[in-house]
């Protein structure tokens, strides 16, 4: 290892005592990956909530993202590619964010004391973001792996079958709150950090943040209920396997 690299590793500065730019670059990458994931979360919620319109609407949305505009029957592998990309971004964002986590009990106690003494709203929001981010890394990874390996199962019958019969309802209720809280807090903190809305006060941004949280959680719960209802209907209609659920979705396809 070069002497300059050793100095930079210990002190965060180059040989000439110039502040290393690596930390700023890592911070930018963390912000960029977080923004991509937050925007994906917003788009994803609107897409899956299409089941609130109708089963056919949800099926058409699923097929659209399989490239049905260009391929007559759609290609589920396209969804797998997107899922793989999101997994990579999620992992990168998680590792970048870990730099700022308390790494031992002593650091955690320092943070807890600081949080208690400051009684600052944004410090509390960071703590919520850290907890939800930790949970989301594991919960979202399971969901994304299913999307990666079983993209053909996405549809009103297939997705609701996974909800009820495969018992994914338990994972999804925790994932819903983790994603919506983490994402809205993240966008709020990014807006302050990078000065995106300089004409809006911090109080105004907080109101927008809480409005986003409430809106997407309510939308998510309504969507969650719709998939549960559809999953129970699947059972009543005698759909016993995922393959049968996929075949039921196929009836929406128009030649």
Swiss-Prot record:
GO terms for molecular function: metal ion binding. Its main location: membrane. It is a multi-pass membrane protein. The chain crosses the membrane at residues 33-53, 78-98, 126-146, 168-188, 208-228. It comes from the Bacteria. Keywords: Cell inner membrane, Cell membrane, Electron transport, Heme, Iron, Membrane, Metal-binding, Transmembrane, Transmembrane helix, Transport, Tricarboxylic acid cycle. It holds the Pfam family Sdh_cyt. Coiled coil: none annotated. InterPro entries: Fum_red_B_TM, SQR/QFR_C/D, SuccDH_FuR_B_TM-su. Disulfide bonds: none annotated. Heme b bD binds at residues 44, 143. One of its GO terms (biological process) is tricarboxylic acid cycle. Its cofactor is heme b. One of its GO terms (cellular component) is plasma membrane. Binds 2 heme b molecules per subunit, called the proximal (bP) and distal (bD) hemes. Heme b bP binds at residues 93, 182. It is found in: Cell inner membrane. Part of an enzyme complex containing three subunits: a flavoprotein (frdA), an iron-sulfur protein (frdB), and diheme cytochrome b (frdC). The fumarate reductase enzyme complex is required for fumarate respiration. This subunit anchors the complex in the membrane and binds a diheme cytochrome b. Belongs to the diheme cytochrome b FrdC family. This is Fumarate reductase cytochrome b subunit. It comes from Helicobacter pylori (strain ATCC 700392 / 26695) (Campylobacter pylori). The gene is frdC.
